[in-house]
Each structure stands twice: as structure tokens, then as C-alpha cells.
Amino acid sequence: VLLLSCLLLAACDLDGDFNNTKDYPLNPLTEIKANLAFSCVHETIPASPTDANTLFQYARWLQKNNQLKQDKSVDTEIERLYRIASENGNYKANINLQNGAMRGHFNVRGEEHLRMSQQLIDAGVATGYYFVGVFLKNGSAGLKQDTEMALRHYRKAADQGSAEAQYYVADKLGPKKIAPAVARQMRKCAAEQGHGRAAAMLSIYLRDEEKYNEAIEVLQMGVAAGESTSASRLSKGFLNPAPSNQSYYLGQQEDLERAARYEKIWRVLANYSYANPTVPDINEILPLPPAQLPPWDGKLQWLEAHLANVP
């Protein structure tokens, strides 16, 4: 009941007072379940001024090229560029700077995290609420650990379109005794925004319910998002495994060419997992049945751009 109450109340307006420790009354379980309704919203990020966007793109290029080397001096330059871009209205730079700091690549003080998160919130960027939820959950960025308030911020972020928050809240609501229908809606919403793990998780539930066509549609979203296991499962699913093979049976007829293409894509995604690959052209290469497969030269849009390595 406590968990559901927190996730419900997080959907209400939050005043941005990150130190709020007010006690909220708990509603009866039946009322909470009735009010957990979720409407899918995709996160929007305001356009950036041209100069700030140029800095962001260059910083992102440096970051991509430093993923394997992890040169600290390069991290310092990336941080500097992200800071300038962020302070000049580039919210993607704000997000990348905070994410990088939480992973130990950049140095961002607690009060800076809160100020930058508030900038996102003020701009209508749902990730701002998600970040505050992380800080409250972990007791970091100068905030006291507060599980209830963390959950409220996660739910607010999910309602406003944060795919990461939608995935996180869905995991909490997923069990049968809580709110699995809401969890499914959140996972689908996150998958539509390119959250590969949400797509993979949702496909498992659809497969178990023998909703195979829905499952492959969601797995296709997973492939587009760069989630390698989605490509692997589709590859094996089109080899027509026995229905008893619960891991890979997807109710599809054998199609060796489809299986081979998905396997090639899986290898690219697995080999370049460190670089966060995606397959935005998946529906051009592998439209789902009953569509016929078009000719394919074996190239992937993301891989070609990655190998070209143009800033």
C-alpha cells in the first residue's frame, strides 16, 4: 500500500522543494489502484540555440571517441563544453553532464545537480524530475534519503514522459498483486521512445500470453533502440523453434532470410554495445511479416555513421 501510495501521489504537482518531508495520508488500496491510471506522454526537449547545439555536438563526438580510451584529460574538456552548452540553453548537454557525473566521468557538485535539475523541470523536461528521484533514492546531491519522495518524483517524471522513469516505475508496479496493466502501458510508452530494456521486458509478458504478433512488434522496437537480445530473439524466432521452446518460440513461420538478417544486426549490436548503437532503419531493412523483404546491401545507418566518425 505504501509503495502504491507513493507512486500515485508522485503524479500530483510537486513544488520543486527538494527538502520537503511532509507526511501524506495513505489512501485505501482500492482507491489507489483506481487512480494509478497512466496516459502515455513522450518526453520533449526544447530546441537549443545554434551555437550551444554546435558545442553539444562536438562534446558528444569527443565523448563517443573516448568511450574505450577513457582519457581523463578528454573527460575534462568534454565536461567544459557540456557546461558551456548547458548554461546557454542546451538541455541535452545538461542531461549528459549530469549522467556523466553520476558515472564518475565529470565533477558536478550536489547543489549544481539540483540547480541543473531544476532548469530541466522549469523547461518541461521530464528527466529533471527523474534525476531528483535518483538523488532522493540514494541520498545524494545534498538531499536526505527519502524513498517516498523519490517514488513521487519518479512517478511525476514517468507521467511527463521520461522513458527511464517509465521503465523504473513499471518495474515496481509489474507484480500481479500491484498494477501490471499500468506497468505494461508504461513499458510500451518507454519502448516507443527508444528504451530497449522496456521493449525486451514487455515482449516477455506478451509472449507468455501467446500474443506473438504484438511481441514481435515490441521486439522490433527493441532492435530499433539497439537492444541486442531483441535482435537475437527475433533471429531465433524466425527459425521456427518448437512451441515448447519458451525462450524463442514466437508463433512465426520459418523464414531463413529474416533470421539471417536479424542475426547480422545482433552481431553489430553486441560488438558495439559500448557505443550505444541503434537501428533507426530497421523497418526498411526488415519490415515485419506479412511484408516482403526488400533488397539489403548489409549496411546499417548507425554503423556507417559511426565508422565515418564525423564530428
Where are each of the predicted segments found?
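Short, charge-rich amphipathic alpha-helical segments embedded
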Residues: 80-107
